[in-house]
């Protein structure tokens, strides 16, 4: 079992139950999935870009990403319907907790000029989104073998009903929030 999953079950869940004054353990907010998305606008003319992004995301997560395609043509962005424009991965269960552990303990401290995460990046329903400017903060990516620096979006979906519950959950996981 993943280290953070055990910590959640044994320490975080009972603490949050008391803190939020919940009756049932199943009411305690928990992280259901983590979605990583890499939007690749520059992939319009080059298939290699998609292949490299798929390889990078696969190294980071240990799971094969899905290529996302344009739903409709947009002349301003020079894309046509059905063209590949990004890659995404959804992590659940043990892989999700292992990725979260690596993100908090190894990757985020490697971000240049890191002052903490924005505590206001909640969506109103307890889900948290953050952006990473460079994929090289992950130790699985070899700096010498990358073709371009690419950013990615990380979304943590929780069962929290409000932003305050979600914030309490992520603070219990020791998320480094700014304020």
From Swiss-Prot:
The keyword Disulfide bond does not apply. One of its GO terms (cellular component) is ribosome. PROSITE patterns: RIBOSOMAL_L5. This is one of the proteins that bind and probably mediate the attachment of the 5S RNA into the large ribosomal subunit, where it forms part of the central protuberance. In the 70S ribosome it contacts protein S13 of the 30S subunit (bridge B1b), connecting the 2 subunits; this bridge is implicated in subunit movement. Contacts the P site tRNA; the 5S rRNA and some of its associated proteins might help stabilize positioning of ribosome-bound tRNAs. Belongs to the universal ribosomal protein uL5 family. Part of the 50S ribosomal subunit; part of the 5S rRNA/L5/L18/L25 subcomplex. Contacts the 5S rRNA and the P site tRNA. Forms a bridge to the 30S subunit in the 70S ribosome. HAMAP family: Ribosomal_uL5_B. PANTHER family: 60S RIBOSOMAL PROTEIN L11-RELATED. This is Large ribosomal subunit protein uL5.
